[in-house]
Amino acid sequence: MQEFDPMNRGFASYRSPRTIALVGKYHSLEIAESLRRLAEYLYERGVSVFIERETAEHIGKIVDLSRWVTCGFNDIGAHADLAIVLGGDGTMLNAARRLARYCVPLVGVNQGRLGFMTDIARDDMLTCMDDLLDGRFAPENRMLLAAEVTRDGKEVASNMALNDVVVDKGAIGRMIEFELFIDGEFIYNLRSDGLIVSTPTGSTAYSMSAGGPILNPTLTGIALVPLCPHALSNRPIIVNDNTDIELRIVNADDPRVHFDGQVTLDLERGDCVRLRRSEHTICFLHPPGYSYFAMLRQKLQWSERPKGP
């Protein structure tokens, strides 16, 4: 139901979906009624509805979901025209990593706090569905990072990240020391609490809290943001998205690598973490009138006047 644009590595447009998967925040029972109402509404509009299996296992304890098919992410990727995610940014991150390889677009309904990636407020959920089903949402492609960890020359792990990949010192208080290489060229030796490697999507997450720049999602760049560097001259830098990045662990007691803050792997001294732009993208579908800067203005409370006593 979508038109793939190979030049942009993503979707240029989409048409009215016939099969929609619903993915919810696993341990948030308060979304149960919203998910049931949404499933009912889509069914009445003639849409085939799938409910992600773990979502159904948790939400099904509160509301009756027995009339709908439940399936895992692999089946969603094989059969769904798009997925609607009910939750916060964390739920979107998990769904994006699981579905990016299948080119399934995502729509976010905000059931969390800030919700930089979940455009639709819960109270507006059903009123927005007509625009979605009639093909009036706007597609936007977001890049992901692909990472692999090698130890003694052998790959021991790999994963993708939509927001960021973070290499840090772990639970031990001492700094981590590693070497940074870009396209095979030595850049610097960094002693710090860690390094955030962020996509434009992730630039409003951990990276922003660490002093990194906000990158418009349409940019093709990767931000490298040191965490509390020992040398204050180690500042955030932006590199091209076709860059190969390599981090070599020189000295650390408990080093770790984190993918979107959700998947963690213990590292060892001498390990290498290699990062590049993933061959996969994820497509977000935005409602009519969506503006990235309007979203930032609202979420970050730009230009807000102080409230009086």
From Swiss-Prot:
Q: Where in the cell is it found?
A: Cytoplasm
GO annotations under biological process? NAD metabolic process; NADP biosynthetic process
Catalysed transformations (reactions): NAD(+) + ATP = ADP + NADP(+) + H(+)
Q: Which superkingdom? A: Bacteria
Known cofactor(s) = a divalent metal cation
Q: What is its main location?
A: cytoplasm
MF terms in GO = ATP binding; metal ion binding; NAD binding; NAD+ kinase activity
Residues that, per the record, bind NAD(+): D89, G90, N163, D164, R174, R191, D193, T204, A205, Y206, S207, M208, S209, Q262
Residues at the catalytic site: D89
Q: Which UniProt keywords apply?
A: ATP-binding, Cytoplasm, Kinase, NAD, NADP, Nucleotide-binding, Transferase
GO CC terms of this entry:
cytoplasm
Write down the EC number: 2.7.1.23
Quote the PANTHER family the UniProt record gives. NAD KINASE
Please give the NCBIfam families that the UniProt record associates with this protein: PRK01231.1, PRK02155.1
Q: Which HAMAP family match?
A: NAD_kinase
UniProt family annotation: Belongs to the NAD kinase family.
Q: What does this protein do?
A: Involved in the regulation of the intracellular balance of NAD and NADP, and is a key enzyme in the biosynthesis of NADP. Catalyzes specifically the phosphorylation on 2'-hydroxyl of the adenosine moiety of NAD to yield NADP.
What is this protein identified as? NAD kinase
Recorded source organism is Dechloromonas aromatica (strain RCB)
